[in-house]
Swiss-Prot record:
Chain sites annotated for binding heme b: 163
Chief location bin: cytoplasm
Lineage: Eukaryota, Viridiplantae, Streptophyta, Embryophyta, Tracheophyta
Cofactor, how bound (note): Binds 1 heme b (iron(II)-protoporphyrin IX) group per subunit.
Role noted for this protein: Plays a key role in hydrogen peroxide removal.
Name recorded for this polypeptide: L-ascorbate peroxidase, cytosolic
Entry's EC annotation: 1.11.1.11
Pfam families the record matches: peroxidase
Keywords recorded for this protein, A-Z: Calcium, Cytoplasm, Heme, Hydrogen peroxide, Iron, Metal-binding, Oxidoreductase, Peroxidase, Potassium, Stress response
Amino acid sequence: MGKSYPTVSPDYQKAIEKAKRKLRGFIAEKKCAPLILRLAWHSAGTFDSKTKTGGPFGTIKHQAELAHGANNGLDIAVRLLEPIKEQFPIVSYADFYQLAGVVAVEITGGPEVPFHPGREDKPEPPPEGRLPDATKGSDHLRDVFGKAMGLSDQDIVALSGGHTIGAAHKERSGFEGPWTSNPLIFDNSYFTELLTGEKDGLLQLPSDKALLTDSVFRPLVEKYAADEDVFFADYAEAHLKLSELGFAEA
């Protein structure tokens, strides 16, 4: 399905470019790229393709959505970003959070994800329970990413590779530890570690291990472990799709 992007004013475009520069410096300095990427993902990942509700429209700044169990700790991200957002009142929260997610990938060495401005903020947070549950397997991943969001099997595996940065925190998800030995570098090590098997100090969630036992997912894991360029290309495409769920639909 093609996209029909809204036209934004030159002033808006200029504000986006300036905000991007500010975000680059800030996220690098605070070493908070994983948290900011999680904010962008969790904001977008609530989209339901049947009802056309949820999605990347800024609602995650509301306390009601931050209170969802899957969003534990994201109030920190919202708080961290607010002083920068205040410098750009013209920019919607919807655009700002997705822009921050794109920057988080880029400054940790990941691919450049295209960004199109023009999302409008929506007033109503989505209901709880739309985000993936890390304790579940491949059927659940397909229900959430495929049926609800409309993403492909390839998108699911590529997006899982976003766990190359960051760590799980017991007080947020019940799990503890990083997925890779360098959690501030975006590379294909999530997949190489997954294929190597469990290691002391590194995390593999049930939803990660599910990628190895599924006949469609596993070959993609192997492909990405063998070729980082292929992973980067597919990741950029999947991240773009996720960041535009329900936005600019032609």
